[in-house]
Amino acid sequence: MKFRILTVCSANVCRSPFIETLLSRALADSPTHFVVASAGENAADGQHACTVVAQDHGTSDAELIAHRATTLSTRAVEAADLVLAADRPSRAAVVRLQPTSHARAFTLREAAVLAEHAVGTERPTHDDPVDALLALVAEMSDLRGTVEMPRSTRHRVPRKPWRRVEVHGNDVPDAHKAVDPVSHAVVSRMIIENASTMASVLSTVVRSASDGTGPGQARYVLG
């Protein structure tokens, strides 16, 4: 079985392709077959990826050079077991397109906090790693509203007139915004930190299911 992850941002040229690249690389050696894809609710199909965010942190251009922007579709959302949106507007676009996705659609930063919390508590045991991952996603959804999310932060706009803008704690901001963008360095730092957390949690769940080392009695039963 495969576990499918869809990453989403507005144009599918900067944030979601970078999240896709990092997750794909981190999960490449997993015994479970992860399929990671990306799309954008306002994407211009075929557009090349922005490599600035990757260059800031030493990711080679080759990892993004083959990327071409893809418009978010109902089929892509329906196929995904987990949707990771860059920010709340992109997450809202996913749910508008496919309302039944609300329980498996999160922002990246929201998902990282919920997943880390879920994996640190008593969780279900499953023989099949994909079942364990699906149960994790369900648990993450159940935890909404019960776990403290990151607070909003203020970041400097990297052009005149110099000022600071507030970024919601659930969002990875868009460095390509026409008004009040933040720097690519801020964006890449947030993506790397939270994608790393997600990859670590997903790998832990797979490993626990594969070798039977997961917590004992399940408090959530899949399906």
Predicted regions and their residues:
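Conserved active-site segments centered on acidic
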Residues: 1-82, 88-92, 96, 100-101, ...
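Acidic side chains
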Residues: 81, 87, 170-174
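Short secondary-structure boundary segments
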Residues: 87-88, 109
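Phosphate-binding/catalytic loops
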Residues: 95-223
